[in-house]
């Protein structure tokens, strides 16, 4: 059985964390990792016990939601709160960090940033990471890896295609169905 890569594993964790987001504008998750071990996670949302944007709407000041703590900051603050060092760690984020999070990541001593999607990627954030010697790499999440029924679905579809072939479906039609299955099961077919 083929196992998923560490990058895919930790990026999937960040996407799961993003599901806890209370921001209706963008759901973001972040996972801090050291030595292939998760040391903290965060998602964008309000302060503990505070009003959530999902309930009351965003509190916009200077085109930013003042109510929301970004996922990266939440993860870094979890480490700070519980005395877990971040020096030399890696962070996996669903979206490219904003300038403020970029500065916090650098100050926390995090050495590598993995992100899945560009989102308002600012050239100054890129410049700061480069100046600080922080490695930045895009790791797009293969969504198939978080589908817990993927193998069963793949097996089922392969069985159906086999039955269609046995039933005498035209080769051209079988080819079309197989191509459609390939797009659904990109990583595994």
Swiss-Prot record:
Keyword Transferase set for record: no
EC id: 3.5.-.-
Cofactor: Zn(2+)
Residues at which Zn(2+) binds: 70, 98, 101
Source organism, top-level taxon: Bacteria
Entry GO terms, CC: cytoplasm
GO biological process: cytidine deamination
Entry annotated with the keyword DNA-binding: no
Keywords, ordered alphabetically: Hydrolase, Metal-binding, Zinc
InterPro entries: APOBEC/CMP_deaminase_Zn-bd (IPR016192), CMP_dCMP_dom (IPR002125), Competence_ComEB (IPR013404), Cytidine_deaminase-like (IPR016193), dCMP_deaminase-rel (IPR015517), Deoxycytidylate_deaminase_dom (IPR035105)
Annotated CMP/dCMP-type deaminase domain residues: 5-132
Gene Ontology molecular function: dCMP deaminase activity; zinc ion binding
Active site: 72
Family statement drawn from the similarity comment of this UniProt entry: Belongs to the cytidine and deoxycytidylate deaminase family.
Protein task: Dispensable for transformability.
Name under which the protein is recorded: ComE operon protein 2
Lineage: Bacteria, Bacillati, Bacillota, Bacilli, Bacillales
